[in-house]
Amino acid sequence: NKERTFIMVKPDGVQRGLVGKIIERFEQKGFKLVALKFTWASKELLEKHYADLSARPFFPGLVNYMNSGPVVPMVWEGLNVVKTGRQMLGATNPADSLPGTIRGDFCIQVGRNIIHGSDAVESAEKEIALWFNEKELVTWTPAAKDWIYE
């Protein structure tokens, strides 16, 4: 139950007022919020975050889009949170996202897909370390824990 994932509401999700709805979905699922901040990410930070995409033709546009407004990076914890979180987000391209997923319900176009989620435990660890220091990761026990896990 200690697996962690990195989730970030992108500038379009912030501008459209979807932060609360996104947090609500993760809370309702039973995942535990460990860290959250509201920030305007620097291009340098975004280039590190998306380093694996740096050779792709869309990379400069991606960095500019992510730097166009504030973002809400978060860390969530729970059983299989990386895999389940990705399922909750829906496909990267909203056109392929099922209704009921975050992208399926709230967005239309791949270039404005409102949210980022780690694709593996290893990438989650890297992304969490990039965006948060150890003191920002809060250790706590939710009152509902025993109603979520056996």
UniProtKB/Swiss-Prot annotation:
Keyword Nucleotide-binding found: yes
Coiled coil (UniProt feature): none
Active site: 116
Stored Pfam families: NDK
Gene Ontology molecular functions: ATP binding; kinase activity; magnesium ion binding; nucleoside diphosphate kinase activity
Documented EC number(s): 2.7.4.6
Name this polypeptide is given: Nucleoside diphosphate kinase
Organism, as annotated: Drosophila yakuba
